[in-house]
From Swiss-Prot:
Keyword Cell division on entry: yes
Identification of the protein by name: E3 ubiquitin-protein transferase MAEA
Native organism: Macaca fascicularis (Crab-eating macaque)
Gene: MAEA
Site note Essential for ubiquitin ligase activity, residues: 314
Catalytic activity: S-ubiquitinyl-[E2 ubiquitin-conjugating enzyme]-L-cysteine + [acceptor protein]-L-lysine = [E2 ubiquitin-conjugating enzyme]-L-cysteine + N(6)-ubiquitinyl-[acceptor protein]-L-lysine
Main enzyme class: transferase
Keyword annotations from UniProtKB, A to Z: Actin-binding, Cell cycle, Cell division, Cell membrane, Cytoplasm, Cytoskeleton, Erythrocyte maturation, Membrane, Metal-binding, Nucleus, Phosphoprotein, Transferase, Ubl conjugation, Ubl conjugation pathway, Zinc, Zinc-finger
InterPro entries: CRA_dom (IPR013144), CTLH/CRA (IPR024964), CTLH_C (IPR006595), Fyv10_fam (IPR045098), LisH (IPR006594), ZF_RING_GID (IPR044063)
Enzyme Commission identifier(s): 2.3.2.27
Domain CTLH: 159-216
Gene Ontology biological-process entries: cell division; erythrocyte maturation; proteasome-mediated ubiquitin-dependent protein catabolic process
RING-Gid-type zinc-finger residues: 314-381
Region: Extracellular and involved in cell to cell contact, residue numbers: 1-124
Amino acid sequence: MAVQESAVQLSMTLKVQEYPTLKVPYETLNKRFRAAQKNIDRETSHVTMVVAELEKTLSGCPAVDSVVSLLDGVVEKLSVLKRKAVESIQAEDESAKLCKRRIEHLKEHSSDQPAAASVWKRKRMDRMMVEHLLRCGYYNTAVKLARQSGIEDLVNIEMFLTAKEVEESLERRETATCLAWCHDNKSRLRKMKSCLEFSLRIQEFIELIRQNKRLDAVRHARKHFSQAEGSQLDEVRQAMGMLAFPPDTHISPYKDLLDPARWRMLIQQFRYDNYRLHQLGNNSVFTLTLQAGLSAIKTPQCYKEDGSSKSPDCPVCSRSLNKLAQPLPMAHCANSRLVCKISGDVMNENNPPMMLPNGYVYGYNSLLSIRQDDKVVCPRTKEVFHFSQAEKVYIM
């Protein structure tokens, strides 16, 4: 029964942590399916139009040359339709195979073979590291690790590389690449009520003001801001006020609008919308898993100033992770468990806790192992006591 409950808990944990592993390729498949449908419908309508024109021409007494020309047009449109259909189906097939490959990989976690389970855990760790590196901007390192581990089709490298191109273009103060991304994902961004495209248009207006191209800025505003309403209308009104001030003005809020730091805000906004679009969290799975693990074993003993209670085997007590775990909550422990400082073994009825006269507690088996001439030396204070002076501790 306990084994079944443990298996169920593991399965639920995987569903939570591995959600992005399946969600990202599924969204890619869905996007390609909708794009294929639009392409095929468009090309089919073109074929229908030329066929209708051919039928209309044949209803009269057409010349041979005109019929041949129309037939060539039909053949050309059919060729385009076939090519677009083949390309679309191939793209969908690639995405479907990727989804299948990831599902098969996740199924491997329930293998009865210890060696296979160990390999799967290693791959899972590598996947977490690759995603974390991609989020941190270490793209080359992430790609090399994915290639070395053979997990290129199990991580979302393509999505992050696309995001990299957009972010780099924004760092160069260019909006074209990001606007193209917004156009590719227009329907889903609209459902999300994203304001990214509007923010980009506002920034383009600001840059025209910065370059003192005020007439171009007015034309830009008429083209892109005519449908603004609500809070967006307030932003437009504020931006239009810049027309009355020079680019080097020190008057707020126009000085803030002209601040180059707005480009960094656009990068953050794009990153946020990109994660929402693919239903990813703001933190990587590696970060969440590490924080959960540290919190599960964190105790007040890990932060005692004298350092006497720190364990060399405790990750939270280590210098590298101690500071990282500081803002995390303590472990919830309904039942206390005493661990011997000497051996690291649990103190229980088979290894009862024994207290020396100086107040330090050790396991009975550990005191036996260090006893010499019926005397024991406290590892912490170096005080010497008779073994008989150790008293059994009872936990209520």
